[in-house]
Design a protein with these regions (language model features):
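Central antiparallel beta-sheet cores of small beta-barrel/beta-sandwich binding domains
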Residues: 1-77, 85-104
């Protein structure tokens, strides 16, 4: 499994601009994702599919905030750094900037 651990990055959207924390964990052999956005209650994330391609993870997830809508995530890891983006229905592409591993 790629990218397990806690990560942080900067995002800029019409709803939030600042640092976001992402926890990627092993959920009984499946990928699990938790996102922490200051001041915003992020609903639970249901993982629909995950594909690994070399150093890149492509995932499709859903949340109760957008029922029945797929959120696509692509993250490419390079040791303790990453870049990537989310494609969120009705919002569009949200880029991860300055992605880096943070202390456990």
């Amino acid at each position: 499994m790629l990218g397990l651990g806690k990560w942080a990055c900067n995002v800029n959207t019409m709803f939030f601009s600042g640092e976001v924390k992402i926890n990627i964990f092993d959920n009984n052999g499946e990928y699990g994702f938790e996102i922490d956005i200051p001041g915003i209650q992020v609903p639970d994330i249901t993982v629909k599919s995950v594909e690994e391609d070399d150093d890149t993870v492509n995932a499709v997830v859903q949340t109760s905030l957008l029922p029945g809508k797929d959120i696509e995530m692509t993250v490419t890891f390079d040791e303790d750094e990453f870049d990537g983006f989310l494609k969120i229905p009705f919002i569009g592409k949200v880029k991860f900037k300055d992605g880096h591993r943070i202390a456990e």
